[in-house]
Amino acid sequence: MADKVIALACAAGMSTSLLVSKMQKAAAENGKDYEIFAKSTADIDNMLAGTGSPKPDVLLLGPQVAFMKGEVAKKAEIAGVPMDVIKMQDYGMMRGDKVLAAAENLMN
């Protein structure tokens, strides 16, 4: 079982798949055992409940769904899961190491 679980949510759960791969690579290079996955924003309630996937230790929203931050933040707070929106620059440039660092900062 992974030490930490990092969930990403975007419009369809597809556009973040490359970013997830880059984050997994960065984690492995640093000896971190993280489970990192992406799903659609429609799955946020299930993710926060740990239904169908492990409950995340942190939830990151893709910048294209940043408008949902207020609503998701309330749900995440109730679930005890820190969350934030991925920086547009890091998302656009697929900087897995930077997004991983942001997730780690939220978990600490």
Curated annotation (Swiss-Prot):
It is an enzyme of class 2 (transferase). The modification Phosphocysteine is found at residue 10. Gene3D superfamilies: 3.40.50.2300. Its EC number is 2.7.1.204. It catalyses: N(pros)-phospho-L-histidyl-[protein] + D-galactose(out) = D-galactose 6-phosphate(in) + L-histidyl-[protein]. Transmembrane segments: none annotated. It comes from the Bacteria. Residues 3-108 form the PTS EIIB type-3 domain. Pfam families: PTS_IIB. Induction: Induced by growth on galactose. GO terms for biological process: phosphoenolpyruvate-dependent sugar phosphotransferase system. Keywords: Kinase, Phosphoprotein, Phosphotransferase system, Sugar transport, Transferase, Transport. The active site is at 10 (phosphocysteine intermediate). GO terms for molecular function: kinase activity; protein-N(PI)-phosphohistidine-sugar phosphotransferase activity. The PTS EIIB type-3 domain is phosphorylated by phospho-EIIA on a cysteinyl residue. Then, it transfers the phosphoryl group to the sugar substrate concomitantly with the sugar uptake processed by the PTS EIIC type-3 domain. PANTHER family: PTS SYSTEM N,N'-DIACETYLCHITOBIOSE-SPECIFIC EIIB COMPONENT. The phosphoenolpyruvate-dependent sugar phosphotransferase system (sugar PTS), a major carbohydrate active transport system, catalyzes the phosphorylation of incoming sugar substrates concomitantly with their translocation across the cell membrane. Involved in galactose transport with PtcA and Lmg_0963. This is PTS system galactose-specific EIIB component. It comes from Lactococcus lactis subsp. cremoris (strain MG1363).
